[in-house]
Amino acid sequence: NKIDWNEIIRISNLFTAEDYHTSKTTPEFNLDLSTWRYFSIDSLFPGKENLIRGKVHSKEALPDGDEYYYIGAKKKNNGIEARCGFDKELISEGNCIVFICNGQGSVGYALYMDRDFMASGDLVLGYNEHINKYTGLFLVTILDKERFKYSFGRKYGKYLPNTKILLPAKDSMTPDWSFMENMIKSMPYGDLI
């Protein structure tokens, strides 16, 4: 298994520095944690319709095709395990936070999915009108910092709704969604997201 350096060089030459040109090179935000508060997952995704389990209970049940991603219980590759066709009964709406609740080694991680997809039954999907690609990335980063609580065989399961995460807040009851969005936008390369 030798590394084909010529192929690596050929591929790297397909991209130029212009492909990654950004005006954002330094963060513009000062993180004042004194305004941050703890919020439970069920307060961020209120109502049973906003925290729902994935619909695919067997990978073999996926329809043939390549229009949609099948997301499984893994962090690598943003959870993508396969591509599949459309099935109205199995599709999950995108623009959500994906909580990995079961599986081998990735329990406790979170993902952000921007498009419709097929979700494993080992996942719980969180929906909130304030979620977008920026707030989604912010939340996933914070949620992944809480992962240590769910290692060594402990699963999200019944603990997920009551899990608390520290977020910027407008007041004790309201997360500061615009701060989260603007912070991600201000990060180096935030304009390329």
List the predicted regions and their residue ranges.
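Sterically constrained small-residue positions within well-ordered secondary structures
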Residues: 61-62, 89-90, 116-117, 154-156
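Sequence-level motif detector for i,i+2 pairs with an aromatic at +2
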Residues: 36, 65-68, 94, 121, ...
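Non-catalytic DNA-recognition/assembly elements of restriction-modification systems
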Residues: 1-78, 171-193
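Glycine-anchored helix-breaking recognition loops at helix->coil/strand junctions
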Residues: 1-7, 11, 122, 139-170
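A generic structural motif
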Residues: 129-130, 167-173
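A short beta-sheet element
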Residues: 80-137, 141
